[in-house]
Amino acid sequence: MSEHKKTICIDFDGVIHDYSKGWRGIDVYDRPIAGAKEGLLALRNAGWVIIIYTTRNDTPKLREFLESNELVFDYINVNPYQPLGSDKGKILADVYLDDKDITFDGDWEKTVSAIQTFTPWQRKC
């Protein structure tokens, strides 16, 4: 029986790529966010499977950015360990890391309020 590999899906824009000007097509125009390289390496060294989970397509420009900045990853927008019969539209992971997220804690009232007042971290600076 194979051992379960801890899997994390990490958003690209706003988490790995600074993305200071928002979407500008397929170009990756900014630098990596400070600490991204070290954080990804720490996850890799702790045994995590790292999936870059982004609305971007898996393009040569995206891979070139990751590789030229020595940003470790295993896959882009795919989990080869995805259970048979599951929807490939949402990649299975143990953790999702995104700059535009709300963590659901079982309280819908609190969650709706958090959604209505949400501001991405980049706009708080």
Where are these regions (language model features)?
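HAD-like aspartate-dependent phosphatase fold
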Residues: 1-125
